[in-house]
A protein has these predicted regions:
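ER/secretory pathway lumenal C-terminal domains and tails of membrane proteins involved
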Residues: 1-221
Length: 221
């Protein structure tokens, strides 16, 4: 991550929603750490008590009770340092495949869900016509997630019937992420676009049938 060169982004070869604008190319390393500092990072750092630190203008809570452990791992330190160094300079996203990882640092109110990722903001997020909160997914940018779900992601492929289910159990969580996002989108679209909500719900149902997670219909609103 530190040494990998930053490649140019070509909007013309990307999905349509990314075209028609200029994408600034980040410069410099992701972390301000020197190579010696990186090499010197310890496997774990013990947390004696709950602590709040300011990283790039965002208050991050280091709470053993929230983390479920009384220490930070090296990966946690690198993640937090990247936030400190890059928030406001580079976009910072958390994949939904990491589950509640970012929430364990008290970042829930700063995270805007966009499909399979959650974008970290410097200011707390408030609900609006386009951003809605939903249990299990946090704040979701509904128009953006809808565009990604139906114009970019391969939902039909994920929902394809598999007689033996998803045979590669270690990667099943990726397929489940499709199901969770489409299920949440169905709930968010129930009132504003019932037809698309039904489409998302059918996809979620078909996707979950290929997994061991099962399917739980979203509550009526």
């Amino acid at each position: 991550m530190q040494r990998r060169p930053v490649c140019d982004f070509n909007p013309d070869k990307s999905p349509a929603i990314y075209r028609g604008r200029t994408w600034p190319k980040p410069t410099g390393r992701v972390l301000s750490f020197s190579d010696a500092q990186l090499d010197g990072l310890q496997p774990v750092y013990f947390l004696e008590k709950k602590t709040t630190v300011n990283l790039g203008g965002v208050g991050v809570t280091l709470d053993p009770a929230q983390l479920g452990r009384q220490y930070l791992e090296k990966a946690d330190v690198i993640t937090l340092q990247a936030i400190k160094d890059q928030l406001g300079k580079r976009p910072v996203y958390f994949s939904r495949t990491v589950g509640p990882y970012a929430d364990q640092f008290g970042l829930t109110e700063y995270l805007e869900g966009q499909g399979f990722v959650r974008k970290l903001h410097q200011d707390a997020i408030a609900e609006s016509d386009s951003i809605k909160g939903i249990q299990g997914l946090g704040f979701v940018n509904v128009p953006r997630t809808e565009a990604l779900a139906f114009q970019v992601y391969h939902g039909d492929t994920a929902a394809r019937h598999r007689p033996r289910g998803w045979v590669d159990r270690p990667s099943e969580g990726i397929l489940a992420t499709y199901g969770i996002v489409y299920q949440g989108l169905a709930q968010l679209l129930q009132k504003r676009n019932p037809q698309e909500a039904a489409r998302a719900l059918v996809l979620a149902d078909s996707i979950f049938k290929n997994t061991n997670y099962g399917f739980v219909p979203p509550p009526e609103r």
